Amino acid sequence: MIRENSYWMGIAEIAVTPDTGVVQVTKFTIGIECGKIINPRQLERCMKSGVVMGVSEALKEEVTFDKGKITSTTWSRYKILTMAEVPEVKAVQISRDDKGYGGGSEGANAVCTPAVAAAFFDATGVHARRIPLPPAYVTTLLKG
């Protein structure tokens, strides 16, 4: 993905439990080539926190409605990734002095959803046509 003069990539490794429909991202590798990197430690923090947000979006986060009104208005109704569910994250940075400068923040969460969806297809042979991937949806998909 190209964003703000930066090139992003994401690779998700997942585990799918067919009986329960639980999808777990076990490892995520995120990479960026954004020109000259000024603060690699801060960029790594942005990359890793973006992965946590993106994986949460891919697996859990969903705004729900009833008769046109939002019903996911509390933390008990709007699910997010727990600390126990956060995958191992590897951040890869490529710095190039000849390219100028690029952005290095919100692209991280943007590559997560397609990476998780691709890993789901690779693991199951089934295309998920929406996100998130809650267990009920996954079991329905796997039953065909």
Predicted regions and their residues:
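C-terminal catalytic domains of large/alpha subunits in multi-subunit enzymes
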Residues: M1-G144
